[in-house]
């Protein structure tokens, strides 16, 4: 029994720098049913597997992480409880998906972003409403809200029925560099978390929003598999740096390139 536990712990340590392939909100509480009208649940059509979350940015477009992609995606809007859906829940499928050059051309620190065009627009309702894109970048020290249906444990996959939310802080990029030495000197990501540990996104939360001082600023991308671990914050794709790309794609300019 002791040997099994030791081996399990070694496996967790080996995964400690793994990408949050489909990323929990560790240390959070159930979200208020009215605070996440823009939050989208993503599923693989073929397998039915939950892939993570996205953010509705207008009636026809969803923004999420590139690594949440599957060949055909089902998107659910107005969802809180998976078992007892809201009456105004709407379901769509992906019509087109847009990436920075290629759906494989992303790294932990660059281009982990995907725009999904829906097969038809969603309608605003009591539990569905788009979230605006940012007009300015966030400031270090900002209080940021994270949310998602990700696992509630970093040692086993326990996906909740309802989304969980937590408040974390926007940190200096150097805090992520200290935790993850492979990070470059600069990247188009945000570093966010609680340095003392205890609150974090985790497996199943990928693609969900980072909302700082009420503004959509980041997309949950990756971090330590030991979710909520001391001095191991999360990395979030910086939405503001990709505004031109996002707006150009939506306007029909599909030849636009992402920022370097």
Swiss-Prot record:
Q: What is this protein called in UniProt?
A: Snake venom serine protease KN6
| Major localization class | secreted
Catalytic residues of the enzyme: 67 (charge relay system), 112 (charge relay system), 206 (charge relay system)
**Any one cellular component term from GO for this entry?**
secretory granule
- Molecular function via GO: serine-type endopeptidase activity; toxin activity
Q: What is its EC number?
A: 3.4.21.-
Classification via CDD domains? Tryp_SPc
The record ties this protein, via Gene3D superfamilies, to: Trypsin-like serine proteases
Please name the top-level EC class of this enzyme: hydrolase
Cystine crosslinks: 31-165, 100-258, 144-212, 176-191, 202-227
